[in-house]
Structures are given as C-alpha cells and as structure tokens.
Amino acid sequence: QQLITFVSQSVLDFLPEDVKVSQELQYTLIKDDYYKGTGNQVLAMNNGKVIDVKKQQVTILDENGTEITFSKLKDIQVKKFQKIKQGDTIALYQQKFKMIFEYLGKQITYQEYLGM
C-alpha cells in the first residue's frame, strides 16, 4: 500500500493542488459494479492520468487521488501515461462496463466517490 500511495502521489505531481472536482458526468448502476451511461462511451469523470491499459481494462488516477479501473471495454482510446480531461472518451462499451474505485488503498463505492 505504501508503494501504491507513493506511485499515486508521484503521478499526481503534475496536477495543480487547488482543483475543484466536478461531478457532471454520471453513470447508472446496473448491478454489483456494472454501470451504463447515456451512450456507448465511457467518459472520464475528472481530470487525471492513465496509469494502466490492458486488453479490455483501463485504470485512471484522477486529480483527487482515486484510482478508477474500468473494465469490460471495447475500442480503448487512451494510452498509458496519457493525461486526460473530464469528458474525454476512454473507451466504448456494449451493454455495460465495470467500474472499481480505490482511494488510499481502500475500495470505495461510486456514491462515496461522487461525494468527494
């Protein structure tokens, strides 16, 4: 967990300290950690940086230090270490996609994330 915190803080050094988090983009919980949006695009909810990209999965470290892992994706449109802005397209999905939120090494819910 110390390594994750160190890496998270190192990656976030490029971001300004006093940034207001906007929660304009929201998704609907289907079941468990599966969500859907209004279209077929997964959009970044906040500014941040892509810290991992796999076959159907992207992990983003956002400006408040939360790691968001999106999975069950199609046509990933970001690359590892790419800076992203709120509203940028991360990937596409078909019927649903999975989102996992982790803050300071602890998994949090989507609702907790929105309240940050």
Tell where the protein language model's regions lie, with residue ranges.
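Intrinsically disordered, low-complexity regions
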Residues: 38-40, 49, 66, 106, ...
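Conserved, short, structured surface segments that act as functional micro-motifs
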Residues: 80-116
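Zn2+-dependent peptidoglycan hydrolase active-site motif and core
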Residues: 44-77, 97, 101
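Surface-exposed, glycine-biased beta-strand/turn segments
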Residues: 1-57, 61, 85-86
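Small beta-barrel nucleic-acid-binding modules, principally OB-folds
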Residues: 26-36, 66-69, 97-98, 102-105, ...
